[in-house]
Amino acid sequence: LKNVTPLQMEKYQSAPFRAPMIIILTTQITDHPKVPKIEQMLSTATAAENILLALHAKNYAGIWRTGKFAFNKKIAEYLNLTPDHEVIGYLYVGTPTGTHKKIPQLDVDKFVTHWSE
């Protein structure tokens, strides 16, 4: 990292301790005539979403994070990942504190377009 303030460095150094467990999401990218790189990465993303759903079902909390360190080659080296692996994010896992956040009801018509009737 370049041009990092002391406050930013403190934030980065404390990030791994925000939760009692971190699941590092990696994808092994292989050349495949029928499965492009993006689909290989999205399959990992799909697995991560299912992990988050399972955590919630078991009354745990989880959040997906990325940021500078998710895509930093030095982190991949530190984790001893081979060059064909990419970190795509981190799942921070723990026990929820407080109550569930109330999510406002959205007007679906603002986000959905119907092409036919």
Please state what every model-predicted region is:
Residues L1-S43:
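Glycine/small-residue-rich phosphate/adenosyl-binding loop
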Residues S14-F17, L81-P83, P104-Q105:
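Solvent-exposed alpha-helices and their adjacent loops that cap or buttress functional pockets
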Residues T27, T66-G67, T95:
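Short secondary-structure boundary segments
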Residues E39, Y60-K74:
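GST superfamily/GST-like fold recognition
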Residues A45-A48:
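A short mixed-secondary-structure module that forms the rim of ligand-binding clefts
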Residues L53-A57:
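Short hydrophobic alpha-helices that are characteristic scaffold elements of the AMP-binding
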Residues I75-I88:
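Short, electropositive alpha-helical surface patch
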Residues V87-E117:
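C-terminal helix-cap and adjacent tail motif
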